[in-house]
């Protein structure tokens, strides 16, 4: 595999960081609040294609729309 997937623990940590006290989640891109993480994805801030690593400081939670809009930019 060219780019290894984000490990389960890293994903869980990213979602935990995006979780509000009421259990909802916030998209780091648009700021929209989601009641569950169903429509959210863990994203590399600096894409792996551009040298980004799968480390906590390079991960954020985005809604599908923001993640698709971002692509590898």
Where are these regions (language model features)?
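Short, charged surface segments at domain edges that flank catalytic/cofactor-binding sites
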Residues: 1-29, 53, 57
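Helix-centric, low-specificity signal for extended rod-like, repetitive segments
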Residues: 4, 62-63
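Residue-level marker of positions within ordered structural domains that often coincide
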Residues: 19, 32, 68
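Short cysteine clusters
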Residues: 27-30, 63-66
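Histidine-centered nuclease catalytic patch
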Residues: 31-61, 73
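A short, conserved beta-to-alpha structural element at the edge of catalytic cores
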Residues: 66-73
